[in-house]
From Swiss-Prot:
Its main location: membrane. The gene is Ccr4. Gene3D superfamilies: Rhodopsin 7-helix transmembrane proteins. This is C-C chemokine receptor type 4. GO terms for molecular function: C-C chemokine receptor activity. Belongs to the G-protein coupled receptor 1 family. The lineage of its organism: Eukaryota, Metazoa, Chordata, Craniata, Vertebrata.
Amino acid sequence: MNATEVTDTTQDETVYNSYYFYESMPKPCTKEGIKAFGEVFLPPLYSLVFLLGLFGNSVVVLVLFKYKRLKSMTDVYLLNLAISDLLFVLSLPFWGYYAADQWVFGLGLCKIVSWMYLVGFYSGIFFIMLMSIDRYLAIVHAVFSLKARTLTYGVITSLITWSVAVFASLPGLLFSTCYTEHNHTYCKTQYSVNSTTWKVLSSLEINVLGLLIPLGIMLFCYSMIIRTLQHCKNEKKNRAVRMIFAVVVLFLGFWTPYNVVLFLETLVELEVLQDCTLERYLDYAIQATETLAFIHCCLNPVIYFFLGEKFRKYITQLFRTCRGPLVLCKHCDFLQVYSADMSSSSYTQSTVDHDFRDAL
């Protein structure tokens, strides 16, 4: 074999080896159709959550200021929970338009809206947790709660809660940015260094602060409340237990799927799970479960406010005296029925009964 033949053979082997090395490399996971799915699925659902959440939580704020006038810790927590949900839903029109088209609002709003979304998310979860603790003190430690459940302590704990929520949301403010790729503008979180580490920490932060800690506290508080109520001869006990069960089940049902999918995406990010089909399913699942979790902010006014008999009475008064486009509300028969029910109700005056009605 001469030198020319050796050279040709070497080149052929190089081409052969390079070809099969390229073929053996993992191909990028194509995710065609995921954005198209989001364009159809997300905007109408975001709009619905925005409208329902804006209406329900605005009514809560209006009633609290007009009738309750923030006289207790419970009132303070209800107000802050409503403000948290309002802050959260006010970001949804931006995300809805972004899902349908692209980000057209600039870098400043990209950072602000991302931050609003996270602050509303964390503060809402935290105030749900505080509502559970408030109920626990009112029913399990009724005497001690007379000193602990004051307006002053309510304001102090609320300020601390907002501070923690703002601090936990700082990554959304600092790392959110706009960039253009293939003539499409994005608003996303981008980490300059240790990208994988930051993504994993952010996801775990949501799992821990958004589900594990609040759920643990809720389960403890409500289990102790139920145990205390078992020793009370209270005609409202069964209703209370059903309501507690509903609160926990709804929280689990709306937030657990999103956190599970988020945790699975963390495993994909760490390359613990490496499956293209799974990644595609997770991208669809994160859109569906995130929207499901958003609906919970529409239910908060119903769970913590509208189901209370005193608050239904205030809402009746509010709509019966309303003016303008809602003037026909005062003619609604169901509101008059609620009003009649309120005036005909009779309750015992025990400490636990009084605190229980305030808490629920």
